[in-house]
Amino acid sequence: MLQTSVRKPINVVVWGENRHEQTDPSIAARYPDGMHGAIKQGIEEYLGGGASVSTVTLDDPEHGLTEELLAATDVLLWWGHAAHEEVDDEVVERVHRHVLAGLGLIVLHSGHFSKIFKKLMGTSCSLRWRGETDRELVWTIDPTHPITTGVPHPLIIDSQEMYGEFFDIPAPDELVFISSFGGGEVFRSGCTWKRGHGRIFFFSPGDQEYPVYFQPAIRRVIANAVEWAVTSRPERTSPQLSRVYSGEFFPEFDPDGNAIKGTVAI
């Protein structure tokens, strides 16, 4: 009899800065459950029981990103804007360590300037922007990429902030989307990288002044990215510097990641 395995739900955490929603009545009205809440709803809408989604915010203890929570999380989504510098460096180091060990990370919109994204990219992550209502066309560059499944070409956002080049990021492993704007600007709006064992996706649409995260196609991109960002490994460990010996292949390792002499000799 054929044995079928049931895939466990993806454990997803949406991290939201949640400052605009508390200080700007128009944004609070636009996102009554917070921007993080709208992002969570979109993932649940498209992935259903395939994902278990929770939210944490900047003002939670340890910004909600405890060691225990990160260890149990498959994919972390990050939206921040006005309070990047309030994120504790110890928490940034913790998230960084988990990404290198296999945590998937999806960075949204102005999260490009977050401490964690800049640390993982190793660049300033600066860009050009125009805070006026513009029309954004999100063009699919790689129609075979799983993040683009079911996404219209182009994806049209009628009202959005402009992001433009030069975007100071390392060359993406994969360029998934490019956006164009009414002023003639273009922007690398969907990019992937691997860092250590972790997968990273940056997706630029999502300014707080517009209801972008309620748009079905945007929700589809984010849900697709959640599925893509999952890594399947027996345990979450970071890559290690490891000494090996002549005549040995796939040796056993000690707790520090060093090969144990005399194991699995060939």
Language-model region placement:
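Short glycine-rich His-centered loop
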Residues: 8-30
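Short hydrophobic segments within beta-strands
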Residues: 13-17, 108, 203
